[in-house]
């Protein structure tokens, strides 16, 4: 397991755009006591060696719940890393392909993870931009090698960068006021205690409802929900996570945003100790980035297109302005999800990254 985790130190040495995952998180991902998703997934970890040193890795994942939901016999590959050597990449992919066949699978797809909150999608455009806490960064030769192995595009995700306006656009101020007055919808900010309790679970049930139709999605179990809440409660800033409720307290939508942890994670070098935790704490509490990651926006299907986003933007822009935030980067969004992509149009978005799920 140590070689599987630490090989990235060789592959990305000197790369200023690479953002490491915390090594403790990688270990937890493949620990059944820490990841309840392994109850319905089979996994196999493969490591490549050349001249006595580790030069690549890949994880094979068979998500039985996802396969049943989408009626496929698919093995996923994830955590794929390799040096600039085609034979290494080919050997890794052949290993996970054979493992899939040995377990009755007839297709392979990735990069994908065990859950839908794991990083997914190989970067195919935007290599000059830094990675983030929620996405994969890889070298430009990765997609070249994948295509040479006859892997083809399944779907692409896009990420955009927008500048935070100096003033809240009148369009959103007007729309937010109209929605509040005519529908009774309003913005609520969760407390940390609410996040840890039943309210936090209700937010995850909303995500299951909103994202159920998206590529490869598998609904979260309540055990997974509790694990995610426990993991991310330390990182969460309630003021930057607006929830929209109706007059009866039903959750209609949620937006999850946070100050970027990119620079702090780079300073950790993947390690919480001895000083990694301090870099993260500073980035969360005192020395916050002027760049925000907009992790997700979810609106209940029957309320989409009814001005809920105006409530989010009206609320968040004022907070961003107070905190001196200059720009925001969206999370990966399927290129076919036109409604989600179009919500950024008033902010003159710039597409900065494209990432791809391959299949064979």
Label the predicted regions.
Residues 136-215:
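Acyltransferase donor/substrate-recognition loop-hinge adjacent to the catalytic core
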Residues 114-116, 165-167, 193, 260-262, ...:
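Short, solvent-exposed loop/turn segments at secondary-structure junctions
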Residues 109, 161, 243-245, 256, ...:
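Short beta-strand segments
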Residues 67-150, 268-346:
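Acyl-donor binding region in acyl/amide transferases
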């Amino acid at each position: 397991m140590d070689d599987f985790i630490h090989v990235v130190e060789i592959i990305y040495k000197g790369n200023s755009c690479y953002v490491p995952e915390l090594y403790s998180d990688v270990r937890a991902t493949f620990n059944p006591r820490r990841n309840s998703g392994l109850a319905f997934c089979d996994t196999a970890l493969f490591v490549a060696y050349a001249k006595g040193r580790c030069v690549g890795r890949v994880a094979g994942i068979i998500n039985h719940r996802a396969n049943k939901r989408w009626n496929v016999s698919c093995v996923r590959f994830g955590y794929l890393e390799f040096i600039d050597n085609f034979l290494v990449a080919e050997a890794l992919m052949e290993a996970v392909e054979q493992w899939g066949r040995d377990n009755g699978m007839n297709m392979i797809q990735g990069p994908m993870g065990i859950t839908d909150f794991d990083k997914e999608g190989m970067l195919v455009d935007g290599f000059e931009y830094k990675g983030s806490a929620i996405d994969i960064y890889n070298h430009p030769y990765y997609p070249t090698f994948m295509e040479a192995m006859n892997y083809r595009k399944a779907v692409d995700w896009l990420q955009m960068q927008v500048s935070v306006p100096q003033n809240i656009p009148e369009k959103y101020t007007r729309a937010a006021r109209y929605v509040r007055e005519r529908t009774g919808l309003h913005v609520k900010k969760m407390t940390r205690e609410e996040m840890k309790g039943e309210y936090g679970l209700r937010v995850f049930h909303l995500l299951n409802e909103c994202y159920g139709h998206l590529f490869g999605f598998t609904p979260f179990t309540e055990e997974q929900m509790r694990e995610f809440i426990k993991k991310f409660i330390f990182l969460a800033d309630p003021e930057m996570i607006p929830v929209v409720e109706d007059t009866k307290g039903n959750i209609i939508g949620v937006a999850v945003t946070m100050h970027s942890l990119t620079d702090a994670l780079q300073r950790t070098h993947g390690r919480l100790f001895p000083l990694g935790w301090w870099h993260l704490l500073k980035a969360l509490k005192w020395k916050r980035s002027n760049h925000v990651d907009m992790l997700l926006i979810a609106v209940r299907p029957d309320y989409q297109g009814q001005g809920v986003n105006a409530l989010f933007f009206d609320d968040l822009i004022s907070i961003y302005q107070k905190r001196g935030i200059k720009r925001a980067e969206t999370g990966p969004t399927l290129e076919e999800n036109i409604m989600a992509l179009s919500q950024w149009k008033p902010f003159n978005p710039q597409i900065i990254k494209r990432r791809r799920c391959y299949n064979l």
